[in-house]
Amino acid sequence: MIKEFKEFIARGNVIDLAVGVIIGSAFTAIVKSLTDNLINPLIGIFLGKVDLSNLKFSIGDATFKYGSFLNAIINFFIVAIVVFILVKIINKVVKNEPEEPEEEEVDVSAQYLEEIRDLLKEQAKK
């Protein structure tokens, strides 16, 4: 069981996924800071409130806190744009890498037929 676990962990996909999750967590913190400390104050200048997360309205006893939702939407769009740009860059890099030509696997029977043909040609010359 330990051997299987080592093989599972050693596969590239698991390691790539782990790296992606760690980088994603760090990136989320950066985007949240960008939104909270730069974008929201800029939007707040026009709305008259710097902290969008406190935006809300009430209907009767119900309070709708839409400011946090706006923050989440802004965060989502920032992440989506960055991921889109990264995917475009990665696709461009992958396209520019020359592909190694794959060796054609010759069918064994075709190989035998070619050898027989060559032998028959040699016999015909004699």
UniProtKB/Swiss-Prot annotation:
Membrane-crossing segments per the record: 14-34, 67-87
Keyword entries, A-Z: Cell membrane, Ion channel, Ion transport, Membrane, Transmembrane, Transmembrane helix, Transport
Keyword Cytoplasm set for record: no
Protein's recorded name: Large-conductance mechanosensitive channel
Annotated GO CC locations: plasma membrane
HAMAP family assigned to the protein according to its UniProt record, in alphabetical order: MscL (MF_00115)
Source lineage: Bacteria, Bacillati, Bacillota, Bacilli, Lactobacillales
InterPro entries tied to this protein: Mechanosensitive_channel_CS, MS_channel, MSC/AndL, MscL_channel
NCBIfam families with a match to the protein in the record: mscL (TIGR00220), PRK00567.1-3 (NF001842)
